[in-house]
Design a protein with these regions (language model features):
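Conserved N-terminal substructure of TIR/SEFIR domains
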Residues: 158-205
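Extracellular glycan-recognition surfaces and repeat-rich motifs
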Residues: 1-24
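Secretory/extracellular carbohydrate-interaction modules
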Residues: 22-98, 170-174
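Flexible glycan-contacting loops in extracellular carbohydrate-active proteins
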Residues: 141-162
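Carbohydrate-binding surfaces in secreted/extracellular proteins
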Residues: 53, 114-141
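Short, aromatic/His-centered strand-loop micro-motif at the edge of beta-sheets
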Residues: 96-119
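Peripheral membrane interaction modules
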Residues: 1, 139-143, 164-167
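Surface-exposed coil/turn segments at beta-strand junctions on protein surfaces, enriched
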Residues: 44-46, 111-115, 124, 147
């Protein structure tokens, strides 16, 4: 379980083995009261690979949702999130840029279950996003852009608490491609310079 978290907005409690989003009711400006929202960011960086978590809703009423943020921009607060319950669907992939943009939605929100431990895994390869829930591929879509490396986290909305365990990031290292002859002095250049620089920058080469 990733240990270091902060709240951009919303309330959460971090315990030894789990993170708890504190649901409730919140007053929104110029609108009716609604379900509490939280944007939680951790210290893990991601630009491809897999992010997994175990998500449990303690109660479910629309618009209960918990999504893994696979991209977060700290300047604009824009993000891309994939998971459970977004925009009234059971499974969701969407982005927020001052408004919601839905990339792929499937399933009915009413089928989400209370106190069920959902094992959620999001995989990103280039612009392709795949969502697995309990080892079943439930959603796959291509974003209209490639996401840069960023810190990741959770987006939650609910009138009740949501528990998240085993939040794990398995980042795929970016790849550097080198075109050169396999002969001296290029072999020495590769070993002494190129490979060392790529190792320092955490790149596969």
């Amino acid at each position: 379980m990733t240990k270091n978290w902060t709240s951009i907005f919303g309330e959460f409690k971090l315990e030894e083995e789990e993170l708890i989003f504190k649901g409730g009711t919140v007053e929104f400006k110029d609108s009716e009261p609604g379900a509490s929202i939280a944007n939680l960011v951790c210290d893990e960086y991601y630009g491809g690979g897999k992010i997994s978590a175990e998500i449990t809703f303690k109660d479910i009423t629309f618009p209960s949702a918990c999504e893994i943020m696979i991209y977060f921009d700290p300047t604009t607060k824009n993000f891309v999130s994939v998971g459970l319950g977004g925009s009234g669907a059971m499974y969701s992939a969407r982005s927020f840029t001052n408004k919601w943009i839905e990339h792929s939605m499937t399933g009915e929100h009413k089928n989400l279950e209370v106190n069920k431990d959902y094992n959620v895994e999001v995989e990103m390869k280039g612009s392709q996003i795949t969502l697995k829930v309990d080892n079943i591929v439930v959603l796959s879509t291509n974003l209209p852009y490639n996401l840069p490396i960023s810190q990741v986290g959770l987006w939650c909305q609910s009138y009740s608490d949501i528990h998240v365990k085993n939040f794990t990031v398995k980042r795929e290292k970016p790849k550097a491609f080198v075109v050169m002859q396999f002969s001296s002095p290029y072999n020495e250049l590769y070993e002494d310079v190129i490979k060392k620089v790529c190792d320092e920058q955490d790149l596969n080469v």
